[in-house]
Amino acid sequence: MLGLIGKKVGMTQVFQGNGVVVPVTVIEFEPNYVIGKKTVERDGYDALIMGSVDLRSSKISKPIRGQYKNLENVEPKRYVIEFKGLKGYDAGDEIGLDAFREIKYVDITGTTKGKGFQGAMKRHNFSGGPSSHGSKFHRHLGGTGQATTPARTFKGTKMAGRMGGEQQTIQNLEVVFIDEEKRAILVKGAVPGVKGSFVIVKKAKKVGV
């Protein structure tokens, strides 16, 4: 499936021809290079291994350098992602935004903002206890255990804990504008992650659903 590695710049708004204001997220793309291939004959499926953003020289080890020894003019990359189902490119090829010209909807994967340790009401949208005078558990979780049987709290019970910092995919975001000169696209709506975080942009898997 066609995809690129991009960077979330932030949100703004644009006016459509009919005067409607549309909130958009700006996503920038540094050059994306094919740094490896997988084939049905050798690996059981077709895929391209893509890389973006040059790795700092202090982070480049000999094993990493060896992976790029057969690639001319391609430096080791910080972000490396495998896109399944893609073929027709060779190692060392650059894939630009022209690949998205005919695409109207995309799926974007990113890491959500970390919120730190949060209570059950914020983390899981629990209603909490009574807010009025006399209650002693306004924002408490409530009971988590069972009766005599099974006499324990089950694993996975929703409780307070670390919130955010998880991988999340938003599907069917409309591509509002593509600026090939500035290597950027505008997509309608919000995208997971903080400003400057890197995201994976793929052709929408379930258009119209």
From Swiss-Prot:
Q: Which UniProt keywords apply?
A: Ribonucleoprotein, Ribosomal protein, RNA-binding, rRNA-binding
- Ranges for region Disordered: 127-151
* Any Pfam family hit: Ribosomal_L3
Could you tell me the Gene Ontology terms of the biological process aspect for this record?
Answer: translation
The protein's GO terms of the molecular function aspect are:
rRNA binding; structural constituent of ribosome
> So what family is this one in?
Belongs to the universal ribosomal protein uL3 family.
Subunit-structure text: Part of the 50S ribosomal subunit. Forms a cluster with proteins L14 and L19.
Q: Which protein, by its recorded name, is this?
A: Large ribosomal subunit protein uL3
Origin organism is Borrelia turicatae (strain 91E135)
Q: What is the lineage of its organism?
A: Bacteria, Pseudomonadati, Spirochaetota, Spirochaetia, Spirochaetales
